[in-house]
Amino acid sequence: MTDLQTQMKIAVAQEAIGEIKDGMILGLGSGSTAALMIKSLGEKLKEGSLKEIIGVPTSFQGEVLASQLGIPLRAFSAVSKIDLAIDGADEVDPNFQLIKGGGACHVQEKLVASIADRFVVVVDSTKIVEKLNLEFKLPVEVLPAAWKLVQKELNDLGAKSDLRMAEKKAGPIVTDQGNLVLDVQFADGISDPQNLEKQINNFPGVLENGLFVNLTDEVLVGEIKNGVSSVNRLKKA
């Protein structure tokens, strides 16, 4: 990550804190930008400028970080609604459709986003794209016994897919749910995210894929202009 990208992430994480109000049940996203937001939230709670916040983590990593910062937490299964969810994304298209799952947390992230009254996405400007999947591969979480079957189904759709391998252990990445991840690339990108999301999720052995369709309410984009970081707020037309 470049210094400029870090500046953009910090700026947008700070902007996101302004969305949080006392007493909220808050979906805590995963990834580097969300982690910066969680750290800032911990500071606000410690100094007393925010109060009575309950966080619902979307990953084990986020749960550990929030716990270390003293943020009160509640499991997803223990809540019926979430006031606000704030999370990052790997790609955002002009219609606010997303690809998420670079950290293999997209199952929990989508659960939290789906019951949130508002879902705000925080990204730096490098994540804004005209079309999904031309650069970033689409993660698909699969049951371990089914990954080859799902890979064949994806190949039949015209996609190329690879089993995501771990960097600091022998073998594949294992998700918080104990599953594997296929990273999927369509040569011409994804033209119809809504249809593809449903199509992939209908394959036997698929738990969830990283397309987030019609969930996002607002996108906060960190930018650098004339060497100064700023935040651009994008809202649905």
Swiss-Prot record:
Among the entry's GO cellular component annotations, what is one?
cytosol
- Enzyme kind, highest EC tier: isomerase
Pathway field of the UniProt record reads: Carbohydrate degradation; pentose phosphate pathway; D-ribose 5-phosphate from D-ribulose 5-phosphate (non-oxidative stage): step 1/1
- Active-site residues from the entry: E109 (proton acceptor)
Residues annotated for substrate binding in this entry: S30, G31, S32, T33, D87, G88, A89, D90, K100, G101, G102, G103, K127
Kindly list the GO molecular function terms attached to this UniProt entry. Answer: ribose-5-phosphate isomerase activity
Sorted alphabetically, the keyword list is: Isomerase
Query: What catalytic activity is recorded?
Result: aldehydo-D-ribose 5-phosphate = D-ribulose 5-phosphate
Q: Which GO terms describe its biological process?
A: D-ribose metabolic process; pentose-phosphate shunt, non-oxidative branch
Name any one Pfam family assigned in the record. Answer: Rib_5-P_isom_A
E.C. number(s) listed in UniProt? 5.3.1.6
Report quaternary structure and partners.
Homodimer.
Annotated PANTHER family: RIBOSE-5-PHOSPHATE ISOMERASE (PTHR11934:SF0)
Role: Catalyzes the reversible conversion of ribose-5-phosphate to ribulose 5-phosphate.
Q: What is this protein called?
A: Ribose-5-phosphate isomerase A
Give the organism, scientific name: Prochlorococcus marinus (strain SARG / CCMP1375 / SS120)
